[in-house]
Amino acid sequence: MYKFTGFTEKANRALNSAIEIAENLGHTYIGSEHLLAGLLREDNGQGTALLNSKGMNIQLCETAIRRNVGVGIPTSLSPEDFTPRCKHIIEQSVTLARKENSGYIGTEHLLSAMLHEEDCLGCRILSESGISVPLLLDELSGGASGKRSYSS
């Protein structure tokens, strides 16, 4: 398991799950779709709770990944195999946590950063599943109250 410094245990598990999911699907990269699946696999993450409340789960996500990308021969990947966009999402999660003066980078920061990249495959999977990315982002950030409803 890789250690991502500054990230919570749940966020670390989600990032490592993203790597594992991409490996198992035989993909040669780790993209936003794998990050979404990694977040969904983290059963206790608050980002997962929000996604589940909207009807998204790991099975639906993995099916959508297979449909959109296909399946290859299982492979071995590392954090260097994150796509430039996914690396940007991870970097943005750090920026979001700092803006909140948070002492950690959690699953909600990863999810929020991904949702800001509306044209990524992770967001497209959510949209194709009938989930409004802008509304999800609004709910994640606390909506009009300005208070975050989900944290981990």
Ranges and model annotations:
Residues M1-S152:
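Histone-fold recognition with a strong bias for associated Lys/Arg-rich disordered tails
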